[in-house]
A protein has these predicted regions:
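BZIP DNA-binding basic region
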Residues: 222-277
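SAM cofactor-binding core of SAM-dependent methyltransferases
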Residues: 7-46, 57
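Class I SAM-dependent methyltransferase "Motif I" SAM/SAH-binding loop
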Residues: 12-16, 192, 236
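Short, conserved catalytic/metal-binding motifs centered on acidic residues
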Residues: 55, 193, 262-264
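Class I S-adenosyl-L-methionine
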Residues: 2-5, 12, 44-54, 61-178, ...
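Acidic-aromatic/histidine active-site loop/patch
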Residues: 201
Length: 277
């Protein structure tokens, strides 16, 4: 049995640590990197080489959000580049990036990258669509399969939410009595709304555990470090068989992956890429 407490995870852009909390609940030891919320600056941060098993984090998403009401500031792309730089410097076994659906692709050398969407409404009665990018040196892929969204879901908690703080905590899966001492009321709501829902974080943490502790599947890689076996055409990384172009969901159809591939063709994502330092 793998002792997860010996597996150091670096959290970038941790905020108030909701994604960190989910990984800690699953047994990982999480080290928090600098965050603007606490006066830190990732641009001045250089993680040590080879010390971290994995890296998790969600760079600021405002520039890529469909709810944005003003022109992009450029900060979003800069922070994505900083995330990729930290991955390249630290060289973990894997990295996981969480963001909004429109975020550009984030690539780093020597990693096979999987991209997929996940909805909080697959697991509870709150709907929140997010985009995940997972990079692995060994070619391992997370198994997170789309489901039907729970009917009559509550709207997700967001940074500018006007609902009570306690209600936002409930929607994010935080325990009764959770508080942020020293924060103004509006700052508390913004910090909680910006976090990764605990239920979603637990699913992602468990997916990492499953793929690294289950009997190993060896992926065939070519000299460019790319998986050579057939994969879904939408970029989610799931294997396909025969003449299929897209993977099937739990209902046995390919509509989710087909629609994602069509969106990608119509509006290709920009790519943030960092070379070896």
């Amino acid at each position: 049995m793998t002792d997860l407490s010996q597996k150091l995870i670096l959290s970038l852009f941790p905020g108030i640590g909701l994604l960190d909390r989910a990984f800690e609940e699953k047994g990982f030891c999480v080290v928090r990197g600098p965050d603007l919320l606490w006066g830190g600056d990732i641009r001045q941060f250089h993680p040590p080489y080879g010390k971290f098993w994995g890296i998790i984090g969600g760079p600021p998403c405002q520039d890529f959000s469909g709810l944005r009401r003003c022109a992009p500031t450029g900060n979003g792309l800069e922070m994505l580049t900083e995330y990729a730089r930290c991955v390249t410097e630290a060289q973990p076994k894997w990295w996981l990036l969480e963001n909004v659906a429109r975020v550009p692709n984030c690539d780093a050398p020597d990693y096979v990258t999987q991209r997929f969407d996940i909805n909080q409404g697959w697991y509870c009665d709150v709907s929140r669509l997010r985009h995940i990018q997972f990079g692995s040196k060994s070619g391992r892929l997370l198994n997170v399969t789309g489901r039907r969204v729970t009917p009559n879901c509550d709207p997700a908690a967001v940074a500018n939410d006007d609902r009570p703080f306690r209600e936002l905590c409930r929607l994010q899966g935080l325990p009764d009595g959770f508080d942020l001492p020293g924060f103004l009321a509006v700052e508390k709501k913004r910090a909680v709304g910006n976090g990764v829902p605990l239920q979603m974080g637990r699913v992602l943490a468990q997916a990492v555990i499953d793929v690294y502790t289950s009997p190993r599947h060896t992926y065939q890689l070519n000299f460019a470090g790319q998986v050579t076996e057939a994969r879904c055409g939408c970029g989610c990384g799931r294997p396909i068989t025969g003449k299929a172009k897209y993977a099937t969901n739990e209902q046995g159809d390919t509509s989710t992956c087909r629609k994602r591939a069509e969106r990608n063709r119509k509006s290709p994502r920009a790519t943030v890429w960092t070379a070896h330092g």
